[in-house]
Amino acid sequence: KWPNQWEVTDPVTGVGIGRSTMVAFTTNETVLSRAEAYVHLKEYDKAVADLNAWIGSFYLVGQNGIESLTRERIAEVYGDPSSDRYIAEYTALEPTSRKPLHPHGFTVEAGEQEHLIQTTLFCRRIETIADGLRWGDIKRYGIVIDRFDDSAYNDDNTTGFTVAATLGEKDLRRALQLPQEVITAGLEANPR
């Protein structure tokens, strides 16, 4: 994700230092943030256009079975249980990419708005993997996180996963703890 760049420090001996550059704001992540904003403004066509721009940065749409998104296709995936493409809501027994949303301080309407938010969150999850940005989505939408114990996993039938811990929608651990120096100086720590 972050390419390694070699900087030669001594050309005679060929010694150098490997460096990686992490870009704070990528175009792709910014486009997905704008798509999310368009969904909240109910400008769904603009949101889908941004989602398609993001997809186009990875894939040649129209080739090898890659299709562009439409509002109808998104509704089929998230709203039509009879469709082969339908994604059911996440449960611990049947994990999927479609998480129940419990937004804090705003609402997400059932139907098209929720479908587009789910699509955008899934794209953001792919785009921001290993960047540490998923936490903002988890907190903002109150997404419940299950941690699985796979010690009894059976590769033959993919069974044996059990939920070891859950971070609930109103779990106090969602608030980051204040630094110890601040607590020592007299500020009350965030409750746990």
Ranges and model annotations:
Residues 1-192:
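Acidic/polar-rich alpha-helix caps and helix-coil junctions
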